[in-house]
Amino acid sequence: MTTQKKQAVTIKGTKDGLTFHLDDRCSFDSIVGELAEKLSSKHYQMEDQPRIQVKVDVGYRYLTVEQKRHIQELITDGRNLDVEEFVSQVMTKEEAEEKRKEAQIVSVAKVIRSGQVFSVDGDLLLIGDVNPGGTIRASGNIFVIGSLRGIAHAGYKGNGEAVIATSHMAPAQLRIGEQIFHWSKEEQQAGDRIMECAYIASDTNEIQLDRVQKLLKIRPNLATFLDEMVEQ
């Protein structure tokens, strides 16, 4: 009885193209050798055929830039294959640090004055006012226990799920992700709108204003922040 040799490389077709699974328990040299052998088939050597997108799943393996380049060249050179992405379950130190920053909550008690820009990674809880001409930015959500009269930009790295909530809403401008909401002079002169929030509505993909309590329905995970704001 012969034992079937475990494959270092498995190629599977998907609706979007091909997925190359590279066994993370095999040596890199074994993977390169088997990959070259499988790609030697004439099936993968038709440059004049439509391009096929390839996803390379490396599992719990960390690949250096040079190793990725080597695998990418092996897959694409002389073939109708394009590497779309490498998928790994391992994060680099830089990626882990970035993820930590995005998950953090920065609490600050201060007044943002005209001309000042205050920016953080993660969520921002500001206890104080944002005066006209002042700007606050966060890669996550923004909560202001005070008056927001300047500019607030939540999700400034492209997070359209971020929200803005404030005790007193009368900003010059609101931004969430790539969306912008301009506050009219008439609205500013009408006075503060108490305990309001801003978020991107899923049906219109535009910034919508509502009572802070609305966030309990659309973002229930923010209940702790909202309870603190209401108590203030």
Curated annotation (Swiss-Prot):
Keyword flag Cell cycle: yes
Listed Pfam families: MinC_C, MinC_N_1
Record-linked Gene3D superfamilies: 2.160.20.70, 3.30.160.540
Record keywords, A-Z: Cell cycle, Cell division, Septation
GO biological process, one term: division septum assembly
InterPro entries: CAP/MinC_C, MinC, MinC_C_sf, MinC_N_1, Septum_form_inhib_MinC_C
SUPFAM superfamilies: Cell-division inhibitor MinC, C-terminal domain
Protein function: Cell division inhibitor that blocks the formation of polar Z ring septums. Rapidly oscillates between the poles of the cell to destabilize FtsZ filaments that have formed before they mature into polar Z rings. Prevents FtsZ polymerization.
Family: Belongs to the MinC family.
Subunit structure: Interacts with MinD and FtsZ.
UniProt name for this protein: Probable septum site-determining protein MinC
Organism listed in the record: Halalkalibacterium halodurans (strain ATCC BAA-125 / DSM 18197 / FERM 7344 / JCM 9153 / C-125)
